[in-house]
Amino acid sequence: MRFGFLLNEVLTGFRRNVTMTIAMILTTAISVGLFGGGMLVVRLADSSRAIYLDRVESQVFLTEDVSANDSSCDTTACKALREKIETRSDVKAVRFLNRQQAYDDAIRKFPQFKDVAGKDSFPASFIVKLENPEQHKDFDTAMKGQPGVLDVLNQKELIDRLFAVLDGLSSAAFAVALVQAIGAILLIANMVQVAAYTRRTEIGIMRLVGASRWYTQLPFLVEAMLAATMGVGIAVAGLMVVRALFLENALNQFYQANLIAKVDYADILFITPWLLLLGVAMSGLTAYLTLRLYVRR
């Protein structure tokens, strides 16, 4: 097929169905943009989780007897527990925090509680850094019930709750994107049907003179995929605008405090090929199936 003929057929299709083409482009842009937003949230969560996992520690709280009478972990019970922790293969580092140090650390982090929190409220503890914070349950189980142990707290459980919110946001974005994608598919199918109907005479003549089905259907496929490509371009541009005007300002304080990973333009560029593949594949497959069902002769 000559490129000039193909280009002319595609442009003719756009001119005859301007409104529907624009609607399809915008719907594709919205669905792909939401899908891209979900992918960015997933990347943000994964990168931020890595930041927090590097800081995650398990805290082994000691009983009142040890906390009140041993400020430097010199008693037999405290030494035995520390040795048991240090000899574990899954432990990277251990440090002892006596009652006074625990109180000072808590007041430094939460000064508003200085007047209501007493020193006796904070037990002594071992702060334990694990080799793999993801595998903390074995350590927690081994420590609970040991002589001198009051309780075990692992920060990863708190982090999991935090990132459950981000997981929920990404799931919501994917769900809305799916609904929009269904709308885009229906628009593509409708556009292809209308385009084929408006050019039914030309198609009939070409088939009479021996043109193959592929020869007559290719312009419709290209038309749908080109419109989808435009939609993907708008979606990517929209993500960059949102990143520049909203995320950069709204999350700047979190970035500076290294509380979450930064969403950069490189992240958007990274997901762009996948968004393009999604948009083009969705439009091309929909157009092909529509033509197979609608244009039977």
UniProtKB/Swiss-Prot annotation:
This is Cell division protein FtsX. One of its GO terms (cellular component) is plasma membrane. Forms a membrane-associated complex with FtsE. Belongs to the ABC-4 integral membrane protein family. FtsX subfamily. Its main location: membrane. The keyword Nucleus does not apply. One of its GO terms (biological process) is cell division. It is a multi-pass membrane protein. It comes from the Bacteria. Residues 1-21, 193-219, 289-297 are cytoplasmic. InterPro entries: ABC3_permease_C, FtsX, FtsX_actino, FtsX_ECD. Residues 43-171, 241-267 are extracellular. The chain crosses the membrane at residues 22-42, 172-192, 220-240, 268-288. Part of the ABC transporter FtsEX involved in cellular division.
